[in-house]
């Protein structure tokens, strides 16, 4: 069987499963999630052994430490994945929820009801936890899912997918509810992008290159999970202690994720006082600073920033820094370079905070908090399938509700249109 036929067969199985999943009862879906959780814990050693192979392969080709961190599983991360499944099982089922209902002059009772999207294709790279997170949210929201991970994590993903696929069938959901493409050839993605009628939506999760390729080449509708060139702006009215805590957290907690800070903007009135303080701390923590001309005059021994640096998602211990003359210049800089993911202002000035919130165009805009909070779990959604940076259908962390659409249900009593 060639690659095209292989992917089409998987999509057909997923389409059949999606029909049954669309009306599966909540108890069965929750049981499937609980069985998935148990199966992960019972097979922890096997998963770790397969993950070890992926890590060794990554190290052989010189993969960065930050990306290896995204790839790595350990006891705690698998336990966290299992616990997240239990949490998802406890969330309210969105399917069948009537968002609003009204009566027309013709005495028709009309309701707007949540329903699944159908078949969701997830194309992702080096994070094995996505295999579980995506499957869990799709199952709970009544969607079937086709998972296509990257070659970096193929052994980990294959092991996890086999385990959770068997678990959902054991729980009583149809075979095909979770499908996994175990061929890493790029052609599998090309086929998925052309399967209109079999796949309802594609969600790419990964680097800028992957996302751009899917968005530009897919005829199947795409929800774009954007890259994160996230900014923190230190206003002239900033509390320096707050600013330091937020910057250290936003840059260093997990530098290789999309909600990590990549660029620091500092108002000129506080730059001479604040930049030496924060740069000293960042250098201690092994962060490379790439600064504008004004920054270079204040902080010695840093790398000159290029225009490209200000638009780049580093996913590493690298930070671009720019001194700005005003709040307006900070907002304009963000407008020019932002990927519209997460942006933050540090200020004690209410007027400046409100202006930043109103004028900055991003999925999440913060006042005095870390960009690292842009996350489905942190927002109270119980996990996410990705963070959308587009404006149609969904924006920001995509939880269960964002994996649904609606239909109108109409109750009549013999009415005809006159």
Curated annotation (Swiss-Prot):
| Chain's role | Catalyzes the NADPH-dependent reduction of L-glutamate 5-phosphate into L-glutamate 5-semialdehyde and phosphate. The product spontaneously undergoes cyclization to form 1-pyrroline-5-carboxylate.
Which enzyme class, named as a word? oxidoreductase
As recorded in Swiss-Prot or TrEMBL, the protein's gene is named proA
Q: What are the record's GO terms for cellular component?
A: cytoplasm
Localization per Swiss-Prot or TrEMBL: Cytoplasm
Q: Which UniProt keywords apply?
A: Amino-acid biosynthesis, Cytoplasm, NADP, Oxidoreductase, Proline biosynthesis
Q: Can you supply a Gene Ontology BP term from the record?
A: L-proline biosynthetic process
* Molecular function terms from GO: glutamate-5-semialdehyde dehydrogenase activity; NADP binding
Record field: catalytic activity:
L-glutamate 5-semialdehyde + phosphate + NADP(+) = L-glutamyl 5-phosphate + NADPH + H(+)
Identification of the protein by name: Gamma-glutamyl phosphate reductase
Could you tell me which CDD domains the record lists for this protein? ALDH_F18-19_ProA-GPR
Which Pfam family is one of this chain's hits?
A: Aldedh
InterPro entries reported in the protein's UniProt record: Ald_DH/histidinol_DH, Ald_DH_C, Ald_DH_N, Aldehyde_DH_dom, G-glutamylP_reductase_CS, Glu-5-SA_DH, GPR_dom
Q: Please report which protein family the annotation says this sequence is part of.
A: Belongs to the gamma-glutamyl phosphate reductase family.
User: EC number(s) in its UniProt entry?
Assistant: 1.2.1.41
Q: In which pathway does it act?
A: Amino-acid biosynthesis; L-proline biosynthesis; L-glutamate 5-semialdehyde from L-glutamate: step 2/2
| Disulfide-linked positions | none
User: Has UniProt tagged this entry with the keyword Nucleus?
Assistant: no
């Amino acid at each position: 069987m060639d690659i095209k036929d292989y992917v089409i067969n998987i999509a057909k199985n997923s389409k059949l499963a999606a029909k049954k999943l669309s009306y599966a009862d909540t108890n069965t879906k929750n049981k499937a999630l609980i069985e998935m959780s148990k199966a992960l814990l019972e097979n922890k050693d096997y998963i770790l052994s397969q993950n070890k192979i992926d890590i060794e392969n990554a190290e052989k080709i010189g993969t960065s430490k930050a990306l290896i961190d995204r790839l790595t599983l350990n006891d705690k991360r698998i336990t966290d994945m299992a616990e997240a499944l239990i949490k998802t099982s406890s969330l309210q089922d969105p399917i069948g929820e009537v968002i609003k209902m009204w009566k027309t002059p013709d005495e028709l009772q009309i309701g707007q009801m949540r329903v699944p999207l159908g078949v969701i294709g997830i194309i992702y790279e080096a994070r094995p936890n996505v295999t579980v997170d995506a499957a869990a949210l799709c199952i709970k929201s009544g969607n079937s899912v086709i998972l296509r991970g990257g070659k970096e994590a193929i052994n980990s993903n294959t092991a996890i997918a086999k385990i959770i696929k068997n678990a959902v069938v054991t729980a009583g959901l149809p075979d095909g509810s979770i499908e996994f493409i175990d061929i890493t050839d790029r052609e599998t993605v090309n086929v998925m992008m052309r399967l209109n009628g079999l796949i309802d939506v594609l969600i790419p999760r990964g680097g800028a290159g992957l996302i751009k390729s899917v968005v530009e080449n897919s005829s199947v509708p795409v929800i774009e999970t954007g890259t994160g060139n996230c900014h923190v702006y230190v206003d002239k009215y900033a509390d320096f202690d707050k600013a330091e805590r937020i910057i250290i957290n936003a840059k260093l907690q997990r530098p290789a994720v999309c909600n990590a800070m990549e660029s620091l903007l500092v108002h000129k009135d506080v730059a001479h006082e604040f930049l030496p303080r924060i740069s000293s701390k960042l250098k201690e923590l092994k962060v490379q600073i790439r600064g504008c001309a004004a920054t270079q005059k204040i902080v010695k021994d840093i790398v000159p920033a290029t225009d490209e640096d200000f638009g780049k998602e580093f996913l590493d211990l690298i930070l671009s820094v720019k001194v700005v003359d005003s709040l307006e210049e900070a907002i304009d800089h963000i407008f020019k370079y932002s990927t519209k993911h997460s942006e933050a202002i540090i200020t004690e000035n209410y007027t400046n905070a409100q202006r930043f919130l109103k004028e900055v165009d991003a999925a999440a805009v913060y006042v005095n908090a870390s960009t690292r909070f842009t996350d489905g779990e942190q927002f109270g959604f119980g996990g996410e399938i990705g963070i959308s940076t587009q404006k149609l259908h969904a924006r920001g962390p995509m939880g269960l509700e964002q994996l649904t659409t609606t239909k109108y249900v109409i109750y009549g009593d013999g009415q005809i249109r006159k």
